[in-house]
Structure formats: structure tokens, C-alpha cells
């Protein structure tokens, strides 16, 4: 095997697989801590897996001798990140299992190689139906949901995914919860999937995190998504990212949403709201994580009292007339949500001191968020 490849692109791809490689476990001799490289035609195929997640990408390469090898992934990335030339030449020694890497005057050889047949075969999910969604939309949906996943419980350790068919188009919806908050976000897609095709899949948290990282490296391209019975595959350009789906049964979130009936609605400027929460955070602690909202005519007072640290409060003028209301929420829940939203304003829908808060974005009907209240400790 002998080929030349763009150094920067190879580093980018090797960096992308590290989250998968790290999952291989503490046995560093495991083949799962290796990356599979195959030079064929005019491309280099890069494959990494931990059985639950599989990453396959194809890079343009000048291939002089075709072949394949497994190389310790972290070591290969360490080597490649030290190289400064635009092109790196890589070859496999004919006499022993050793990979030679050269760039400019720098020359490495690594013995941490295994035969290609040791690597697990790649079996992507098969389905006649796929959908296409823009990278920008998929990234927004992921950002607006991944923060409220509960990793400790199998049935909610991931994003519930379903297809919603509306008159305005077909939407891919993701729903996440940790039992104390619920996030719903959806994005328009192109394709022939109907509501029965996806059949309420549960995407695991680790896959969501890897997808979120991958979307940051692409621009206006589209993702093609395929759902099998037990697997899903997200592909873009020459990259395929496939993973096993979770078995858990997600709670009936529609039942939760149908019980909401907020009669007090307040619109806040997100930037100002976030700024106040930062000041609230000065006095939050493990024993005092809640922030109190006191709503009255034309005013919302946000406050915290920590018996060990001190207190803070700040008023926001609001367009509200009605009964007074005091309600407390986790400071971190609102902080997480505001950090995920790209919006100028947010609307809080309230109804009583022990009922959930419905958070929406004015002018948008593709997302909503539910936050459970806390007992007022201040």
C-alpha cells in the first residue's frame, strides 16, 4: 500500500473519529482502538467503529499501490498533527507490519499495525426509504434537544425521532427529556418517508453528540438519513455515520403537552434574560440551584437567596396584567435552554406555581420546551 494525501484533510477526519475510538474501552490492544485504512482507486477509505457507532469517510488520494491496514488511531493522529507540509506520503512496509509516514523532511514509522482482516466488517442499515435534510436545519434541531437527554435511564437516553406530515411539508422531529424538562424541535426535510416509516426511533445520546460535532464541519450541504429496524445511517458527501438504535420506550410526550394550559404569557428578550441568569449564577450552589420568578402587573422579578452566600434580585418590565405568581425553577435548566436557542425573544407560558412552564419562540412553531418547577427554597 502506498498513497499521498492532503495532510489537513487527513487530520480533520482522524480528529472526527476520536470520540468513537475512545469508546473502545481500556484494553488498548483491542482492534476497536485502531482505524481501518484502505487505499483503492483514487481514494482513501477511513473506517472507525466501537460496534455501536461506525464512521466511514472517503478522502481523495493519489494511490500508487492499493492496499489496506489497521493502525492505532490515536497514535496516527498524534503523528499527523505534528506535520506541517500540505501533502503526506504513507506506505506499508513489504517486509513487516509497519506504516511509513513522511512529510517534507519528517519521517515516521509506526509498528502499531494490525492486518486489515482483523477489523469488523461494515454493514450499513438497508431501507428503500430515505430523507434529506439540510446540515443547517439538522444542526439546529440537535442543538435544541441534546442538552436535555438523561443518560442514566435507557428509555430516555437519547432523542425520540419521528416523522410529522403537515400541509406545509414533512418534518423530522426530535424529542428529549430527563424527566424534569422536555425539548421538542423539528425541521423540514425532503423525501418519501411518512409517519409510519420511522416508527418512533430512539437515537442514543453518544450518537447525537457525535452528529452535533460532525454538523459543525459542514456548511450548506444536505444529510441523507436512512432508518433500519435496529440502525440508522446519516450520510453527507462521502461520509457515512451509522449507529445502533436504543431499545427503550420513550414516554408519551403528547400526553404531557396536551395537559398544558398556560394562562400567563410573558415575552422576554433572550439576551437580557441570559444576562440576568448569569448574575443569578453567582449565588447558585448544589444546595440552592433554584431561581424564583415573581410575576406581577407589568413586572417580572427574578431572584435567588442562598443562606450561605447571599442574595440577588432584578426586575424586568413585561407586558403582563393579571394575578400575581411566584414560581421557582432550576437555574441550570433555563441557562441550558437559552444557550441552545438562536432567537431574539422567548415566551414563558405559566399557570400556577406547581405547573410546568412552556417556553416557546415567538414567530416559530417548530420548537417548544417544557420545564418543571421546583419547590421554592428561597
Task: Indicate residue ranges for each PLM-predicted region.
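Structural preference for solvent-exposed beta-strand-turn elements
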Residues: 1-378
Amino acid at each position: 500500500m502506498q498513497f499521498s494525501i492532503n495532510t489537513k484533510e487527513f487530520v480533520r477526519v482522524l480528529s472526527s473519529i476520536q470520540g468513537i475510538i475512545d469508546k473502545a474501552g481500556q484494553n488498548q490492544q483491542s482492534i476497536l482502538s485502531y482505524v481501518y485504512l484502505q487505499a483503492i482507486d483514487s481514494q482513501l477509505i477511513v473506517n472507525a467503529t466501537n460496534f455501536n457507532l461506525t464512521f466511514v469517510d472517503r478522502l481523495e488520494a493519489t494511490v500508487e499501490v492499493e492496499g489496506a491496514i489497521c493502525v492505532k488511531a490515536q497514535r496516527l493522529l498524534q503523528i499527523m498533527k505534528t506535520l506541517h507540509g500540505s501533502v503526506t506520503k504513507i506506505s506499508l512496509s513489504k517486509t513487516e507490519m509497519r506504516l511509513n509516514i513522511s512529510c517534507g523532511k519528517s519521517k515516521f514509522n509506526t509498528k502499531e499495525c494490525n492486518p486489515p482482516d482483523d477489523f469488523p466488517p461494515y454493514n450499513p442499515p438497508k431501507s428503500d426509504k430515505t430523507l434529506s435534510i439540510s446540515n443547517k436545519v439538522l444542526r439546529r434541531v440537535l442543538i435544541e434537544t441534546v442538552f436535555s437527554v438523561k443518560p442514566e435511564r435507557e428509555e430516555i437516553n437519547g432523542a425520540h425521532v419521528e416523522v410529522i406530515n403537515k400541509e406545509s411539508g414533512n418534518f423530522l422531529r426530535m424529542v428529549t427529556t430527563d424527566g424534569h424538562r422536555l425539548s421538542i424541535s423539528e425541521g423540514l426535510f425532503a423525501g418519501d418517508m411518512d409517519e409510519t416509516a420511522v416508527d418512533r426511533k430512539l437515537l442514543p445520546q453518544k450518537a447525537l453528540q457525535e452528529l452535533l460535532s460532525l454538523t459543525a464541519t459542514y456548511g450548506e450541504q444536505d444529510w441523507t438519513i436512512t432508518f433500519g429496524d435496529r440502525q440508522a445511517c446519516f450520510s453527507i458527501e462521502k461520509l457515512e455515520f451509522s449507529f445502533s438504535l436504543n431499545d427503550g420506550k420513550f414516554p408519551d410526550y403528547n400526553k404531557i403537552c396536551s395537559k398544558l394550559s398556560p394562562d400567563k404569557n410573558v415575552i422576554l428578550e433572550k439576551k437580557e434574560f441570559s444576562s440576568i441568569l448569569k448574575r443569578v449564577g453567582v449565588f447558585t450552589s448544589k444546595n440552592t440551584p433554584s431561581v424564583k420568578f415573581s410575576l406581577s402587573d407589568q413586572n417580572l422579578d427574578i431572584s435567588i437567596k442562598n443562606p450561605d452566600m447571599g442574595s440577588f434580585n432584578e426586575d424586568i418590565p413585561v407586558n403582563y396584567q393579571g394575578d400575581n405568581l411566584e414560581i421557582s425553577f432550576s437555574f441550570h435548566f433555563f441557562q441550558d435552554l437559552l444557550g441552545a436557542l438562536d432567537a431574539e425573544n422567548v415566551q414563558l407560558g405559566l399557570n400556577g406555581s406547581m405547573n410546568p412552564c412552556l417556553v416557546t419562540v415567538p414567530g416559530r412553531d417548530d420548537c417548544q420546551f417544557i420545564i418543571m418547577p421546583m419547590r421554592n427554597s428561597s
